[in-house]
Every structure is written in structure tokens, then in C-alpha cells.
Amino acid sequence: MRRSIAARISIVVLAFLAAAAPRLSRAVDAAVLHFDSASSPPNNIVIGFVGGFVSHDNSRHGPVQLAERIRQAVPQGTYVRVFENRRRKRAYDAVVRLLDTDRDGVLSPDEKKRAHIILFGHSWGASAAVLLARDLRRLGVPVLLTVQVDSVAKVWQNDSVIPDNVAEAVNFYQTQGLIHGRREITAADPVRTEILGNYLMDYKKDPVQCPDYSWFAHAFTPGHMQSECDPHLWTQIENMVRQRLSPQPTSAAAAQPLNPTAAK
């Protein structure tokens, strides 16, 4: 009951934040690829989800900025795209289409084996990343890494248990304001999934300036807002992603987040 009430409050608050957010002109198409889709499948698939009712190309938001930096820096042959959290089915279809190299509508064991997928998101988008990983599990498709930033689940969702097709998962959260993220994620199978950590971002101690966000966000959801515009946090995530997209990925231990404020 308490969770249901909290979820309803989150919906109302996130809707207000979306209404208060300034509208931007369309950014560069988030579907721009670093490979020729007509010739070969991508070596890497990186998919992000924005939170609330944010547009996938609103460049003032952390996931969109991260995707653009990854596009500009990662190896050729990498597909990078951001989706609205409500477009999970569209993201799923994109992954299946990219993996289905023979275009027969069915993923073969070899096509699944070639999957090199990283998923990340903020708020409702973080929950969407976990749910997409779960969708891919039903197909037998592995996921390298999921990254949750201040993850907020909708009423019918479970963003706390990471499915066993995910190799590594990490969770960042804060506790300030009306909306705050899940404190802890766990692995459905600890043998197959390594939880890199549940990291508290203390914005009372180390505040982040977010001048482009609404007065409502500053007043009522300051921590949630800061988790989305925190350059240090998103740089850590970018480094984690880039390490795993290199030809010879570093070990899980070497790729853990750098000096988090606190670890659970």
C-alpha cells in the first residue's frame, strides 16, 4: 500500500516536472549509428532510457548527453540510442532487429552469442532498463551491464532484482526530496550476475548546480534532479560503458565506479 501511494506521488511529480521543463528544438537524431546498417551488424549495442515524461532527444538530460558523448568516442560499429521509458517495446524490437543478421525473424544461438549489450537509465528509465534486460532474458540474449541512476519503478514494475542474463549491474541512488531512487538491487543469480555496488550520492554534502532545471525540481525533487545533471556521476558511467566496449574489456573489479561517496 505504501509503495502504491509513493508510486502515485511519483507519477504526479514527474508529470509536473515534464510540464515545467523548457521545450527544446530537436537535437541530433538519437538513432545515428556508427556503422552501416546495410552491411554488418553492430559490434556493440548501447541503449539508454530517460526518466519521467522527458523526450528522448532533450539534450538537457543526463542520459541524452551521455549517449551523445558515447557516440562521439566509442569504436566504429556501435549502435547508440536513447528511448523514452514508455518505449521499451520499441527498444526491444530495435535490439532484436540488430541481432537478427539473416533477417529470418528468429534469433539463432550464434546471433544471440554475438550480443554485446549495455543498458542504462534514470528514474523510470532505470526501471525500464532492468525490464528490457528481463525481456531479453526470455529470448536467451545476454546483457553485459545495466546501470540504474535513482531508479523509480512504476506501480506494476520490479526494478530491484537483476535477471541472470546480466553479467554486471550497478545502482546509484539518493535520498533527498519527494522522489528518490531504489536503495538496493540484488541478483536473481549471484553466480551469474555481479552487483558492482549500490552507491549513495549525497547531494546535501556535495551539491550539484543544475541551472537549466525548473523551480519545481529545485524545490521539491532536488536530489533526483541533481542525480540527472551530476557531471561526475555521468562521467563515471561513461567510463564504465567505454571500458566494456573496448576490444578487450577490463575485468569487473577494475571497472567499478570511482570513489563513490558511500557504498552500501
Where do the model's predicted regions map?
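Bacterial N-terminal signal peptides that target proteins for export
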Residues: R2-S10
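Bacterial N-terminal signal peptides
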Residues: S10-A19
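Boundary at the C-terminal end of the N-terminal hydrophobic targeting segment
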Residues: S25-A30
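Active-site catalytic motif of lipid deacylating hydrolases and related acyltransferases
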Residues: F35-A115, A219
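Solvent-exposed, acidic/flexible segments
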Residues: S55-P63, R88, Y92, G121-A129, ...
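Serine-dependent carboxylesterase/thioesterase catalytic core
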Residues: L66, I70, V95-A187
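C-terminal catalytic-base region of ester-bond hydrolases, centering on the histidine
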Residues: D164-K264
